[in-house]
Amino acid sequence: MVQASSHAEGGHEGKQGAARSMGLLVAAVGVVYGDIGTSPLYTLKEVFTGGYGVQVNHDGVLGILSLILWSLLWVVSFKYVMFILRADNQGEGGTMALTALARRATAEYPKLRALMVGCGLVGASLFYGDSMITPAVSVLSAVEGMGLAFEGIDHWVVPISLVVLVALFLVQKHGTEKIGKLFGPIMVTWFVVLGALGVHGISQSPEVLKAFNPGWALNFFIVHPGMGVAILGAVVLALTGAEALYADMGHFGRKPIARAWFALVLPALVLNYFGQGAILLQNPEAARNPFYLLAPGWALLPLVGLATMATVIASQAVISGAFSLTRQAIQLGYVPRMQIQHTSSDEQGQIYIGAVNWTLMVGVVLLVIGFESSGALAAAYGVAVTGTMLMTTILVSAVMLLLWKWPPVLAVPLLVGFLLVDGLFFAANVPKIVQGGAFPVLAGIVLFVLMSTWKRGKQILVDRIDEGALPLPVFISSIRVQPPHRVEGTAVFLTARADAVPHALLHNMLHNQVLHSQVVLLTVVSEDRPRVPEHERFEVEAYGDGFFRVLLHFGFMDEPDVPAALKLCHLDDLDFSPMRTTYFLSRETVIASRLEGMSRWRGNLFAFLLKNANGNLRFFNLPLNRVIELGTQVEI
């Protein structure tokens, strides 16, 4: 009986584990694969109507299908799913997590480290451009299907798209926890429909299956040597969203993402692309919109509705990704501090950043109004996608060779293969800069300048403050000679350098002529890892005479809640009771000068960013009624 009960319990646990795995897989489909899953809406349409000169004939269709298939297999299946997903930073993925990993890998090589940081900032900058283009091109391509169902409705495509997109951005501050539970089932339905439509098309012209032979892709390059590389600029549209597999790894883990790709997403995409190819062989006129013309007439309107929902979900994924990337960048010191609002009491990762949301919304609206169609926007899309992919490969190269210590004889050929393919896709998109691709490039340049200026400015600011800093042992020795009046309580002084006296402490002594019975010099350290366990959160050192040095360590995915962290400091001599603890902050006002380190215009830009950044009070969750802020001017 006991044995039977044990088997029953084991079976129950097994069923629970299977149900959880299936739940993670469905959730991953809803969040991770929205972008790449909506690519069939516009990819083949752009290939054959985007001015590349590809003929809608037997060889042209099979050549393009083979290129798309083998691009999906090499870039997504092999490079991302089987390789890049293993380059996690304690389970987290994405540009900033990978940059932190590459910084650690190149710690002994300052110049190489600076190059890796630069690549990371470029990749992050292009991702923000992608976060504007994805909602615009996806929703436009879905709504354009209405033009096939109703004649004369084309002029309504832009207004309807704008209504959908603006509504999406307006609901962000309320969170998407409730409707987010529907994303997975809707996207699973979407991929099933993609596959079913593909099977329907293939059944009418099975010869498209010949495109599984990579010889058709090679033949296309041989027959069209000039067009071959250029057409990669359109083929890459089938790969948009591949970066999301890596960026969202922290939410679901590598295995559910990989299983969802091989079990559902990849088969559905391949079937649909081949189905579109089949109807193009039967009717070359279908090139104007092969996705929607693949569907029977009765299914057109329901398909437009489902496609619109799928594109909204894809847009939501990149918007959430932009919020997450921004939080990581803030923690790592690349972006000024902003107000971060949590939209879910259960899910820590569900956040809202107003400044990012409204900036993205303005960018998306301008893109829709300026480009008016998904075809026109496709040129801008490829530059952002391929640039981000290329930066990811460069960062992974450093991690593989210097952190994982892979033998060069194994690593170099693999990396050369990745870089060669990424380089070809990027080169194919460079000419598009004059056709609309300038937008993500300009957006990337602006964001790169902002992030690099902030990072450099903060370093110069710390150096300037440190120049005249009084060493802490000297200060303690001086107060032993002339002891000031001590008052009850704990004074916490936030400082970037724990071995020197912060300006706020000196100003307090100068003006008030008193010291608290306990003086804590607190330094918050941002780690190159996502989370720091509680037992590694703090370091405490007692200097005597009531002075303590405390270091708090936070990862780039941790909430830097200083009062909560200080409660973990278990020392008999330290008392962090809320009503006995006062926090002293320094508020620096920057004056741009001609001193070495930063040009005048960048100094002014940094001063503007610093003035408008969220201060330590909100960022560290300090109690408003227990904070005293003292100002100081610093030249940079």
From Swiss-Prot:
A GO-annotated cellular component: plasma membrane
Transmembrane parts of this sequence: 22-42, 64-84, 114-134, 150-170, 182-202, 220-240, 261-281, 293-313, 351-371, 383-403, 408-428, 433-453
Family annotation (Pfam families): K_trans, K_trans_C
InterPro entries, alphabetized: K+_transporter, K_trans_C, K_trans_N, Kup
Subcellular location: Cell inner membrane
Reactions accelerated catalytically: K(+)(in) + H(+)(in) = K(+)(out) + H(+)(out)
Name of the protein in its database record: Probable potassium transport system protein Kup
Organism: Pseudomonas entomophila (strain L48)
Gene: kup
